């Protein structure tokens, strides 16, 4: 929410890393992130 780098880069890597889990992680607590 600061620049255009961490915004499209963060969700892109997460989506490819966890796939559909990315959307679930946004609503759920950062369990896989930690």
From Swiss-Prot:
Compositionally biased intervals (Basic and acidic residues): 24-34
The organism's place on the tree of life at top rank: Bacteria
InterPro entries xrefs: MgtT (IPR057128)
Induction, per UniProt: Expressed in both exponential and stationary phase in rich medium; expression is higher in exponential phase (at protein level).
Region (Disordered): 1-34
Miscellaneous information on this protein: This gene lies just downstream of mgtS on the same strand in another reading frame and is encoded antisense of the mgrR small regulatory RNA gene.
Protein name: Protein MgtT
């Amino acid at each position: 929410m600061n620049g255009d780098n961490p915004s499209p880069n963060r969700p892109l890597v997460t989506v490819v890393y966890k796939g559909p889990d990315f959307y679930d992680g946004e609503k759920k607590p950062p369990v896989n992130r930690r």
